[in-house]
From Swiss-Prot:
Pfam hit, one: RRM_1
Location of the protein in the cell: Nucleus; Cytoplasm
Primary gene name: ncbp2
Stated name of the protein: Nuclear cap-binding protein subunit 2
Keyword entries, A-Z: Cytoplasm, mRNA processing, mRNA splicing, mRNA transport, Nonsense-mediated mRNA decay, Nucleus, RNA-binding, RNA-mediated gene silencing, Translation regulation, Transport
GO biological process terms on file: mRNA cis splicing, via spliceosome; mRNA splicing, via spliceosome; mRNA transport; nuclear-transcribed mRNA catabolic process, nonsense-mediated decay; positive regulation of RNA export from nucleus; regulation of translational initiation; regulatory ncRNA-mediated gene silencing; RNA splicing
Cellular-component GO terms for this entry: cytoplasm; nuclear cap binding complex; nucleoplasm; nucleus
Binding, mRNA: Y17, Y40, R109, T110, D111, W112, D113, R120, Q121, Y122, G123, R124, Q130, V131
Molecular function via GO: mRNA binding; RNA 7-methylguanosine cap binding; RNA cap binding; snRNA binding
Quaternary structure and interacting proteins, as annotated: Component of the nuclear cap-binding complex (CBC), a heterodimer composed of ncbp1/cbp80 and ncbp2/cbp20 that interacts with m7GpppG-capped RNA.
Domain RRM: 37-115
Length: 153
């Protein structure tokens, strides 16, 4: 048991999160996640650019493509993106070394993604942004100010 803990790489292990909109069963999703070269990147500032993402993530390997998350109504950035690498090894490097780093005064959060599909770049909240931003009551300049619910009062 102690030896298995030594081989564990918690930065690369799959998290408990699973995409609720994944089309397929849980074992299919797990299998795709274990071989994926695509990362979900969250907690980004609404003002973080694709160029900044590329500059940071290319330090871990060759980036194949970046898909910025967009507000489905306004088509503006809404705090997440997908980063796809050519190899799993490069994606694992990013999971180890970029998760938890700071970009635009925000702590970047990375997780495995089963692979980008068209349409997933749009935020899932009611107004097209991220759900948690709609209910946020504090002021966050990197997220466009106050949450949308607070702004409506």
């Amino acid at each position: 048991m102690a030896l298995s803990a030594l081989r564990s790489d918690s930065y690369v292990d799959l998290s408990q999160y699973r995409d609720q909109h994944f089309r397929g069963n849980r074992s299919d999703q797990e299998s795709l996640l274990k071989q994926s070269c695509t990362l979900y990147v969250g907690n980004l500032s609404f003002y973080t650019t694709e160029e900044q993402i590329h500059e940071l993530f290319s330090k871990s390997g060759d980036v194949k493509r970046i898909v910025m998350g967009l507000d489905k109504v306004k088509k503006t950035a809404c705090g997440f993106c997908f980063v796809e690498y050519y190899t799993r090894a490069d994606a694992e490097q990013a999971m180890r070394f970029i998760n938890g780093t700071r970009l635009d005064d925000r702590i970047v959060r990375t997780d495995w993604d089963a692979g980008f599909k068209e349409g997933r770049q749009y935020g899932r909240g009611k107004s097209g942004g991220q759900v948690r931003d709609e209910y946020r009551q504090d002021y966050d300049a990197g997220r466009g100010g106050y949450g949308k619910v607070v702004q409506s009062f």
